[in-house]
Structures are given as C-alpha cells and as structure tokens.
Amino acid sequence: MNIFVTDPSPTLSARSLPDKHIVKMPLETCQMLSIVCSEKWGHGYGELHRLDGQPYKTEKGAFRKHPCTIWANACLENTWWLLAHGLALANEYQWRYGKIHSCEKTLEEAVSIIPSAPYPYRPKSFTFAGPDEFKYDTSICLLYTSPSPRDATLSRMPSSA
C-alpha cells in the first residue's frame, strides 16, 4: 500500500504514473480512505462500500499503521489530497482504458461523507514509505512522465473545488 506522489497536484501526480499504478492504486486509495472514515480507526465519517455494495472491512484495522494511512488520517487536507488523487487515478484509468474503474463509485461516496477542506488541498508534507536509501532520490520522478497533456480539471470533483 502506497501513495505515489510525483507532483504536488493530485491530478498531475496521477497522470504521470505508469499503467500498472493507474490500475491498482485506486483500490489502495479506497482501502486507506476506509480506515480514515471508520469509527474505530479513523474519524467516524461512515462506511465506504465496494462496487458490490459490501462495506470495506475495517474491523481489524488492516493498514492502519502504514505510514501512508497514518498520513492520510492526520488531517483533512491530507485526506482530501488523497481523495482528489484517487479521483484523478480513476479519471486517468477511464482516459487510458475507456472504461470506469471499479473503485470510482467508492471514491464518489467518500466525497459525500468526508467533511470539506479548503481547496486546493495542500498537505504540509508527504510521507515516504520506502527504503531509506531512496528517501531523497528524486530521479524516479523523471521516469514518470505523462505522454500527453490533458485538461487538469476532474469532472467528478466536488463543486467547491
């Protein structure tokens, strides 16, 4: 479970990721947000549901101690940045593959239950959940470049955005 931040903009960060990340990261985003929203481990905003209608299982608090989940749970700005990034990932998935990601409905549900935060979402910092030897290595960002620019707005962002 990780958040791949290649740019302070959640949209530009999503666009620059390779296909593999575009496919799998929306699910990891939903898993982190389900902990943030949970009564037991997060802020009690409510349950998030999978596409099949079942709630994400949070009883055991899986991933609650992961650095990225802790970061997302720390403040609303972080939570909303992650949510905006998740929506951008789903948008990018639709642009690249021509179909809707199975996590999109969950991300839209999160928009409706998480309290608002000032836009633009600007976390004070991001967390790093990799080996220390790569902590300050920015060369990886050079590998992730978007093949073509697209409109920076997200059609599914809340109206306050």
Annotated model-derived regions:
Residues 152-153:
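Ala/Thr-enriched low-complexity intrinsically disordered regions
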Residues 123-131, 138:
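Acidic, Ser/Thr/Gly/Pro-rich intrinsically disordered interaction regions
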Residues 156-161:
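Hydrophobic alpha-helical segments, chiefly the membrane-spanning helices
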Residues 51-55, 59-61, 102-124:
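Charge-rich, acidic-biased intrinsically disordered regions
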Residues 80-114:
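Charge-dense polyanion-binding interfaces
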Residues 144-149:
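Conserved small/polar residues in nucleotide/adenosyl-binding loops
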Residues 1-94:
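An N-terminal structural lobe/cap that precedes and organizes the functional/catalytic core
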